[in-house]
């Protein structure tokens, strides 16, 4: 097997505690653009066609492993935090195959690495028959990073850590990203790393000297964008990483035919899919498994999570959709809320301050204002008046109601579930409907109006004079009576 034909295995180091995050959540599980940081590393490894991916866990191992369950990776636990060299060895020894693959080392807190960068790194490693290839970058000020020191011929000589560097070495701009491609000998050499240092830890960087002692080829592959190897060790760096990913994601969507009216304010998670000629107004947030079809407009400051929006849908500003399916040509909002289980068929109108949950509205249904529609199926072309409430909860259980097609529900009506309203029925405004309504019937369920002539004059005349003086309009009105 030639060097170029070797399979690729990946070890992802994700065992650190991340104390600078000051969080109960393991560092690598902090989300960036819709994925935990470690999931970005897994995604990149999969894009390379890796044969085997092992994630090394330690702090919060159960949480990390649960978060990645079903992703196709395997896990190895680092029992004690003994440094990167020990963590790598734990992961390498857990690989299914030994001694026949190149091994890529990634970190669970570097979510910005592009698969194309890693492909180029791997290609360089194999083209030069290298034993160890280090991914490096340059910064005007590389404070905090280990520096790459080269000999007079430009070959990598050693890596010096920040705390051990001389002033001259600290001036070096090229730094070690911590990402490596190693040949199949790496696990064997890693067993020879010692912890003879002030921290008493095993450092993966010591592999460089061990390879050099073997006379092996060691290279550095320098990338042009140092942002790619930006680690997120605290909340500030997490926000910086999120901003980089947001720009990447937004740019990709714009290049694919999506209009973002103010990209700096729009957040689209990596798991979202958008069609062509979609328009996103300022402040829009799209999350989870949201799928948006061609020609959809989403208004300013709307939040859409795990929802499907079919062709031509209009979501007006300040609307919140979660777990909803909105059919072609429907419009929602402004200030509407569609909760999980909502299905709007074609050309449905949901207006301002309407809330739905576990509701299916057939084609042409209109609910224009101030309504709650929960646990209900509503037939085609039904009109839901302002203030309509489906009273679906009895204090213990939710109950389902059915409203037929072509029904007219007057304003401020309450349907006390479970109810069945037949096709073409009328519900009078202000009714509290507590019995089923047959097809084509009119239901009126409200108290009879009483009108008491002269009541206001008697009421105010009996009021204390001090109260009447606070109402200047009242004296004039009483004089006219």
Swiss-Prot record:
Which superkingdom, per the lineage?
Bacteria
Specify the species: Deinococcus geothermalis (strain DSM 11300 / CIP 105573 / AG-3a)
Q: Which Gene3D superfamilies match?
A: Hexapeptide repeat proteins, Spore Coat Polysaccharide Biosynthesis Protein SpsA, Chain A
Which residue ranges does the record annotate as region N-acetyltransferase? 257-481
Reaction(s) catalysed (UniProt annotation): alpha-D-glucosamine 1-phosphate + acetyl-CoA = N-acetyl-alpha-D-glucosamine 1-phosphate + CoA + H(+); N-acetyl-alpha-D-glucosamine 1-phosphate + UTP + H(+) = UDP-N-acetyl-alpha-D-glucosamine + diphosphate
Region feature (Pyrophosphorylase): 1-235
Give the residues annotated as active site.
Answer: 369
Chain's role: Catalyzes the last two sequential reactions in the de novo biosynthetic pathway for UDP-N-acetylglucosamine (UDP-GlcNAc). The C-terminal domain catalyzes the transfer of acetyl group from acetyl coenzyme A to glucosamine-1-phosphate (GlcN-1-P) to produce N-acetylglucosamine-1-phosphate (GlcNAc-1-P), which is converted into UDP-GlcNAc by the transfer of uridine 5-monophosphate (from uridine 5-triphosphate), a reaction catalyzed by the N-terminal domain.
Task: Specify which residues bind acetyl-CoA according to the UniProt entry for this protein.
Answer: 386, 411, 429, 446
Q: What's in the GO CC field?
A: cytoplasm; membrane
In what pathway does it function?
A: Nucleotide-sugar biosynthesis; UDP-N-acetyl-alpha-D-glucosamine biosynthesis; N-acetyl-alpha-D-glucosamine 1-phosphate from alpha-D-glucosamine 6-phosphate (route II): step 2/2; Nucleotide-sugar biosynthesis; UDP-N-acetyl-alpha-D-glucosamine biosynthesis; UDP-N-acetyl-alpha-D-glucosamine from N-acetyl-alpha-D-glucosamine 1-phosphate: step 1/1; Bacterial outer membrane biogenesis; LPS lipid A biosynthesis
Binding of UDP-N-acetyl-alpha-D-glucosamine occurs at 13-16, 27, 78, 83-84, 107-109, 146, 161, 176, 233, 339, 357, 372, 383
Protein name in UniProt: Bifunctional protein GlmU
């Amino acid at each position: 097997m030639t060097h170029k034909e070797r399979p690729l295995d990946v070890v992802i180091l994700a065992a650190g505690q991340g104390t600078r995050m000051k969080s109960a959540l393991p560092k690598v599980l902090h989300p960036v653009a819709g994925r935990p940081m470690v999931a970005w590393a897994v995604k990149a490894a999969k894009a390379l066609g890796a044969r085997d991916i092992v994630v090394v866990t330690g702090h919060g191992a159960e949480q990390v492993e649960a978060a990645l369950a079903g992703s196709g990776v395997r896990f190895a636990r680092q029992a004690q935090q003994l440094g990167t060299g020990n963590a790598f060895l734990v992961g390498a020894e857990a690989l299914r195959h030994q001694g026949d693959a190149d091994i890529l080392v990634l970190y669970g807190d570097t979510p910005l690495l592009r698969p194309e960068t890693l492909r180029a790194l791997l290609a360089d490693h194999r083209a030069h028959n290298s034993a160890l290839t280090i991914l490096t970058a340059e910064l005007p000020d590389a404070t905090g990073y280990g520096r790459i020191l080269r000999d007079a011929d430009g070959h990598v000589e050693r890596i010096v850590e920040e705390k051990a560097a001389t002033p001259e070495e600290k001036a070096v701009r090229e730094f070690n990203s911590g990402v490596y491609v190693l040949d199949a000998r790496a696990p064997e050499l890693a067993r020879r790393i010692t912890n003879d240092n002030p921290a008493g830890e095993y450092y993966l960087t010591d592999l460089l000297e061990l390879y050099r002692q073997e006379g092996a080829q060691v290279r550095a592959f320098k990338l042009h964008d140092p942002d790619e190897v930006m680690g997120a060790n605290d909340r500030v760096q997490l926000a910086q990483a999120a901003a980089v990913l947001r720009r990447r994601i937004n740019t990709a969507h714009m290049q694919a035919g999506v209009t973002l009216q103010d990209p700096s304010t729009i957040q689209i998670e990596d798991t979202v899919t958008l069609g062509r000629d979609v328009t996103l107004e300022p402040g829009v947030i799209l999350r989870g498994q949201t799928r948006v079809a061609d020609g959809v407009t989403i208004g300013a400051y709307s939040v859409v999570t795990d929802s499907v929006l079919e062709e031509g849908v209009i979501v007006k500003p300040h609307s919140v959709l979660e777990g909803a399916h909105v059919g072609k040509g429907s419009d929602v909002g402004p200030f509407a809320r569609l909760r999980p289980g909502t299905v709007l068929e074609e050309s449905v109108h949901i207006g301002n301050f309407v809330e739905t949950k576990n509701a299916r509205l057939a084609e042409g249904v209109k609910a224009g204002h101030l309504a709650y529609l929960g646990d209900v199926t509503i037939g085609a072309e039904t009109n839901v008046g302002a203030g309509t409430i489906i009273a679906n909860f009895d204090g213990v259980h939710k109950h389902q109601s059915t409203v037929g097609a072509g029904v007219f529900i007057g304003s401020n009506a309450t349907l006390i579930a479970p109810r069945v309203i037949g096709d073409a029925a009328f519900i009078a405004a202000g009714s509290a409907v507590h019995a089923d309504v047959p097809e084509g019937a009119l239901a009126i369920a409200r108290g009879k109006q009483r009108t008491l002539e002269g009541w206001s004059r008697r009421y105010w005349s009996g009021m204390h004079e001090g109260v009447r003086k606070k109402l200047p309009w009242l004296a004039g009105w009483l004089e006219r009576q």
